[in-house]
From Swiss-Prot:
Protein name: CUE domain-containing protein 1
Residue ranges of domain CUE in the record: 50-93
SMART domains on file: CUE
Compositional bias segments (type: Gly residues): 11-29
Record's compositionally biased regions (Low complexity): 1-10
Segments of this protein annotated with the region Disordered: 1-45, 152-178, 196-225, 270-302, 369-388
GO molecular function: ubiquitin binding
Family annotation (Pfam families): CUE
SS bonds (residue pairs): none
CDD domains membership: CUE_CUED1
Superkingdom in the source lineage: Eukaryota
Length: 388
């Protein structure tokens, strides 16, 4: 209050326009006052404070005034500080509360009456109207609430679909499918033609995928495709075993396998003679060429005949061939493990050329001989100790 009255007194003594509403009319003449007022009015801005801070300041300035009255005056002036102070001063003077502020002033001089008249008089027609009040960005009643509310969430964005666009395309409009190309018609589908074959062979195995295998058969030939895959895999396994010459010699020494192979060959010849009568004459002349070849090179002819018989093996013969191949692989592994554990002297005693051709019986003989020598060594040592 002291600073407010000092500002009013300084405005009246110097003739400035920063005091109350009519402070410029006391210093100059009647012609220059409106001009000074017009020059200084645009520079004056309406001061607004935060609601709680303004209420605390006004309550400190006017302790004898009710809190609700101060709030009503502040809301009536839309938060303008200067207008609220003017009205509160006027109300305080009318209520007879001016003596409370005289004690707090720096000097005991009373307020000049002209200052009070200029401060409390209503706006004259000569002055400019006050600027248009612009409401604050925040709501005035927001400070009355005990807790501040969160700002409202914006509504979700809804894309307006086109009239002819279906719901599925509207949902996945931003999905970019990978460039895989067009899939075949029977991809992940069971055609009606395949139902009979699947029901007829419920235990059939699924075809395996391989890079070097035969081309896949069409959909209706699912069972034929399974059989072709099985045949292809069996042929590959047989070809790997038949590349080993030692395994080929073991097959030629196996009597049961040779009998089964001959039985399959005769069955194949009988089926071939029934299907094609002209092939019987050609087959009849075939054995005549065999003796000629056997005389020139009997080893090559026997190998060629044996390999030709292997082409016409039946299922039982193939099964026996796999059993022999499994036994041969196990025997080879055992033989390699024995070579690693044998002493160096015994490994040097065997010839390098016959190291891979040792039979299982010969391996047992060497092992028994080695064990016998090891058992004789402690007996000799005990005899020498007893003699000493």
């Amino acid at each position: 209050m002291t600073s407010l009255f000092r500002r009013s007194s300084s405005g009246s003594g110097g003739g400035g326009a920063t005091g109350a509403r009519g402070a410029g009319t006391g210093a100059g003449d009647g012609s220059t006052a409106p001009q000074e007022l017009n020059n200084s009015r645009p520079a004056r801005q309406v001061r607004r404070l935060e609601f709680n801070q303004a209420m605390d300041d006004f309550k400190t300035m006017f302790p004898n005034m009710d809190y609700d009255i101060i709030e009503c005056v502040l809301r009536a002036n839309s938060g303008a500080v200067d207008a609220t102070i003017d009205q509160l001063l006027q109300m305080n003077l009318e209520a007879g509360g001016g003596s409370a502020y005289e004690d707090s002033s720096d000097s005991e001089d009373s307020i000049p009456p002209e200052i009070l008249e200029r401060t409390l008089e209503p706006d004259s027609s000569e002055e400019e109207p006050p600027p248009v009040y612009s409401p604050p960005a925040y709501h005035m009643h927001v400070f009355d609430r005990p807790y501040l509310m969160a700002p409202p969430t914006p509504p979700p964005r809804i894309d307006v679909p086109g009239s002819g666009q279906p719901a599925s395309q509207r949902r996945y409009r931003n999905w970019n499918p990978p460039l895989l190309g067009s899939l075949p018609d029977d991809f992940l589908r069971i055609l009606p033609q395949q139902m009979d074959s699947i029901q007829g062979h419920p235990g059939g195995s699924k075809p395996m995928s391989g890079e070097g295998g035969p081309p896949p058969a069409p959909g209706p030939m699912a069972c034929d495709q399974d059989s072709r895959w099985k045949q292809y895999l069996e042929d590959e396994r047989i070809a790997l075993f038949l590349q080993n010459e030692e395994f080929m010699k073991e097959l030629q020494r196996n009597r049961d396998f040779l009998l089964a192979l001959e039985r399959d060959r005769l069955k194949y010849e009988s089926q071939k003679s029934k299907s094609n009568n002209a092939a019987v004459g050609n087959d009849g002349g075939f054995p005549s060429s065999v003796p000629g070849t056997s005389e020139t090179n009997p080893t090559v002819s026997e190998d060629a005949l044996f390999r030709d018989k292997l082409k016409h093996m039946g299922k039982s013969t193939r099964r026996k061939l796999f059993e022999l191949a499994r036994a041969f692989s196990e025997k080879t592994k055992m033989r390699k493990s024995k070579k690693k554990h044998l002493p160096k002297l015994q490994s040097l005693g065997a010839a390098a050329s016959t190291a891979n051709l040792l039979d299982d019986v010969e391996g047992h003989a060497y092992e028994e001989d080695f064990r016998g020598r090891r058992q004789e060594v402690p007996k000799v040592e005990e005899a020498l100790r007893e003699g000493q």
